[in-house]
Amino acid sequence: MSGRDGGERTPLLEAHSLTTSDCAAGAPDPSRCLKTEASQVMAETGEGYFEAVALPPPQLPEEESAPSTAPSDPGCAGTFQIRAGGDGGYVVPEARLEPAPPPTESLETASVSLATDDSLGNGCQPGEPQGLSREKPLETCGAEKLGSDLMAEAKAEEVKTEEGPVFSVAVDEEVVGKEGAKEEEGVEQGMEVEERPVGEEIEMVENRVVEEAGHRPLRMDLRMNPLEAIQLELDSVNAQADRAFQQLEHKFGRMRRHYLERRNYIIQNIPGFWVTAFRNHPQLSPMIRGQDAEMLRYITNLEVKELRHPRTGCKFKFFFRRNPYFRNKLIVKEYEVRASGRVVSLSTPIIWRRGHEPQSFIRRNQEVVCNFFTWFSDHSLPESDRIAEIIKEDLWPNPLQYYLLREGVRRARRRPIREPVEIPRPFGFQSG
């Protein structure tokens, strides 16, 4: 390369790397020249990250005298320029920053890129041999640093893009491997099923039927549990009702006792009251025959009392005055309900006078009819329970209605009753 006035010019380099400086004749560092050649080879083969761009033809002498600060081509606004001469040298445009296709992964490429990075790092260090370009502007150093940053970002993006497909390929291989294993297991199971004899299949079906049958009671239990809970709640409510009923019964029983005592006192002064009521009752009259009617004339009072609990039983008390038939003044007939639900009847034995024992049964149309006084001593006849129920539920609550029938109606009208008469109520509220 000669001066500005004469001589032929040496041809410029066809391509310059973005990250290297020119190897001029005055540059004493041969290693840097080798690095520059390596970067040029990389640009020519397309293995680098940036493509080399051909330089424009040399300018005419008139154009050479123009200052180096002339504006460049707007199309080349993104290119970097390096001053080639000293005071009056021309500007050499360098390669544009354009992304290149991803390089092939090899040791040579890695070494070239490392050498290029070293040259970039050394390009802006102070005290390096400067050759032709002794005064490198700050813009060139900034451009070189920017190029190195862009190269690092490009490398990171390539690593990310390379990791994604590799990972997806690995996942696809795992999925394919699992599907293949499942298909092999299904084939093996099918072979095992085919190899099983018919007897084993029948046993398996029977076992399934037994298991399903064993689960059915559990479902019934699930249905029975709410029903049992409801029944327990109902039992508790019934128990509360029983307790409340007992309390009310004791309360109103004391109030009724006063009226019952007054009623009994009046009945005792009416001769033949109870025998008239018994004989006028439509269900009790068939049992009163001959001698029974004569003995009932001596009844002075009748009391019906329930036991401590209304549902545990009741007690009948018959009061007699002195008579020629038996010696008892009080005969008691009691019915008691045991815990098992069985009803047991007890009675006071009658002490008969000699020659006045009543007939136990009266035969009518080949049917055995219970005698009224036999009801006290015989506890096996079903009609004895019927007599107790009639006396308790019908006769005792309101004996006056049966006394006033037939002949007693006229007498009741002539002599009005001054004492208050109790309104008929269920037997449960008539305890004394």
UniProtKB/Swiss-Prot annotation:
GO terms for cellular component: chromatin; nucleolus; nucleoplasm; nucleus. There is a cross-link at residue 160 (Glycyl lysine isopeptide (Lys-Gly) (interchain with G-Cter in SUMO2)). Its main location: nucleus. This is Testis-specific Y-encoded-like protein 1. Ubiquitinated by the CRL2(APPBP2) complex, which recognizes the Arg-Xaa-Xaa-Gly sequence at the C-terminus, leading to its degradation. InterPro entries: NAP-like_sf (IPR037231), NAP_family (IPR002164). It is found in: Nucleus, Nucleolus. Residues 1-31, 54-110, 116-135 are annotated as: Disordered. One of its GO terms (molecular function) is histone binding. GO terms for biological process: nucleosome assembly. Keywords: Isopeptide bond, Nucleus, Ubl conjugation. It holds the Pfam family NAP. Signal peptide: none annotated. It comes from Bos taurus (Bovine). Belongs to the nucleosome assembly protein (NAP) family.
